[in-house]
């Protein structure tokens, strides 16, 4: 009886592309509400980080909330939109 060794082909997986979830400023939503929604929507979002994102969007017009896989970016952006915040997502180049 002979023993034959099969070679396993090396498969290199490409890393999944990442997407930025963006929060756009609006002048009507209370700042505390934006902070609250960010903390409820994004896992492990700390109040200080949520406040920083809110202020960046308020002062600069837009802020990056999180960079993640497409499926998560879609979910987070849609969740922010459901809470009457303006959010989009785009590839992270």
UniProtKB/Swiss-Prot annotation:
Coiled coil: none annotated. InterPro entries: ClpS, ClpS_core, Ribosomal_bL12_C/ClpS-like. GO terms for biological process: protein catabolic process; proteolysis. Disulfide bonds: none annotated. It comes from the Bacteria. Pfam families: ClpS. Belongs to the ClpS family. HAMAP family: ClpS. Binds to the N-terminal domain of the chaperone ClpA. Involved in the modulation of the specificity of the ClpAP-mediated ATP-dependent protein degradation. PANTHER family: ATP-DEPENDENT CLP PROTEASE ADAPTER PROTEIN CLPS, ATP-DEPENDENT CLP PROTEASE ADAPTER PROTEIN CLPS1, CHLOROPLASTIC. This is ATP-dependent Clp protease adapter protein ClpS. The gene is clpS.
